[in-house]
């Protein structure tokens, strides 16, 4: 990505999410929502386990719950740069179709998949998951990892997924939601919610109850519900958003570079770096818009971290559902 492209992305985002409009009243289009989305996801953590292994375990667990089998045709909704698609393809032997509306991410996904020697098994399409361009009853299964939360209306996206699944097929999702501990009358809770919405580019973050209701509303049979973020793990999931954790993982330099290359490991950004970036932007060392990008990162990280600590936000609310047999 060039500096001019980064500036365009930053300006485009902030035309959508202005500080004075940080409220549920503004509804972004799916194109606006997806264009600024980070490429990675969060996961549960285990002591002495490398981060890369934790991420893969999180993906494989979802594949297991969806019961993905060798040779099946599976769709990945909001696939990013294809890391879960490649991981699950290797793990299961299934044929994965990754769907994403971001052309730049798809170019990288195809390149990485070719380098991994998996192009025969994993393919990618540039499509909107609110208007999936596949026929009814096409896929043997579907999954989504922290992506369908970007849909303004969960019923709309879930209904499209339901449509393209074969009868009896399963859909598993790690949905990013507000938990039942969220209290809209609590000012701190509302601030956390706003920071997640504004920082993440969400039209509105849904509650766990809304996600479950949306599944049932479109016709899915809900087989399992499990908030993995609420598990009594030795290392809470939000720990991965902290500086000490990433430093231990050896991701410091990668994380700093990621601020400008839309990768996932951006949590090392802090208030001090905000000031430094602002100064370097003034000196034209960094492109225009860099300060806004850093402010954006700090906003969502603060929201997610505090949301995790308070138990009011989970990025891994697992729902496994099935399309009824014909």
Curated annotation (Swiss-Prot):
Keywords: Methyltransferase, S-adenosyl-L-methionine, Transferase. The keyword Transferase applies. CDD domains: AdoMet_MTases (cd02440). Pathway: Alkaloid biosynthesis. GO terms for biological process: methylation; sterol biosynthetic process. Gene3D superfamilies: Vaccinia Virus protein VP39. One of its GO terms (molecular function) is sterol 24-C-methyltransferase activity. One of its GO terms (cellular component) is endoplasmic reticulum. InterPro entries: Erg6_SMT_methyltransf (IPR050447), Methyltransf_11 (IPR013216), MeTrfase_SMT (IPR030384), SAM-dependent_MTases_sf (IPR029063), Sterol_MeTrfase_C (IPR013705). Its EC number is 2.1.1.-. Belongs to the class I-like SAM-binding methyltransferase superfamily. Erg6/SMT family. Methyltransferase; part of the gene cluster that mediates the biosynthesis of paraherquamide, a fungal indole alkaloid that belongs to a family of natural products containing a characteristic bicyclo[2.2.2]diazaoctane core. The first steps in the biosynthesis of paraherquamide is the production of the beta-methyl-proline precursor from L-isoleucine. They require oxidation of a terminally hydroxylated L-isoleucine to the corresponding aldehyde by enzymes which have still to be identified. This is Methyltransferase phqN. It comes from Penicillium fellutanum. The gene is phqN.
């Amino acid at each position: 990505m060039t500096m001019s492209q980064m500036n365009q992305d930053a300006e485009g985002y902030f035309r959508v999410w202005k500080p004075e409009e940080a409220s549920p009243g503004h509804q972004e289009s799916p194109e606006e929502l997806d264009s600024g989305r980070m490429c990675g996801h969060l996961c549960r953590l285990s002591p002495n386990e490398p981060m890369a292994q934790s991420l893969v375990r999180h993906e494989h667990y979802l594949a297991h719950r969806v019961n993905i089998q060798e040779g099946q045709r599976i769709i990945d909704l909001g696939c990013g740069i294809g890391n879960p698609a490649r991981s699950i393809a290797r793990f299961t032997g299934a044929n994965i179709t990754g769907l994403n509306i971001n052309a730049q991410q798809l170019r990288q996904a195809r390149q990485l998949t070719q380098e991994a020697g998996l192009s025969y098994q994993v393919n990618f399409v540039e499509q909107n998951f609110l208007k999936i361009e596949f026929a009814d009853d096409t896929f043997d299964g579907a999954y989504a990892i922290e992506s369908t939360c970007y849909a303004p209306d969960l019923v709309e996206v879930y209904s499209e997924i339901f449509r393209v699944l074969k009868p009896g097929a399963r859909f598993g999702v790690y949905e990013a939601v507000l938990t039942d501990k969220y209290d809209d009358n609590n000012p701190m809770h509302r601030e956390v919610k706003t920071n997640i919405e504004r920082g993440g580019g969400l039209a509105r973050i849904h509650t766990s109850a809304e996600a479950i209701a949306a599944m049932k509303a479109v016709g899915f049979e809900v087989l399992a519900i499990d908030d993995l973020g609420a598990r009594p793990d030795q290392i809470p999931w939000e720990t991965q958003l902290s500086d000490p954790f990433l430093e231990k993982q050896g991701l410091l330099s990668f994380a700093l570079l990621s601020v400008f290359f839309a990768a996932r490991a951006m949590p090392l950004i802090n208030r001090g770096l905000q000031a430094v970036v602002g100064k370097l932007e003034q000196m034209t060392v960094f492109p225009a818009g860099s300060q806004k990008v850093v402010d954006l990162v700090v906003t969502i990280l603060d929201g997610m971290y505090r949301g995790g600590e308070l138990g009011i936000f989970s990025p891994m609310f697992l729902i496994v559902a099935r399309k009824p047999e014909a």
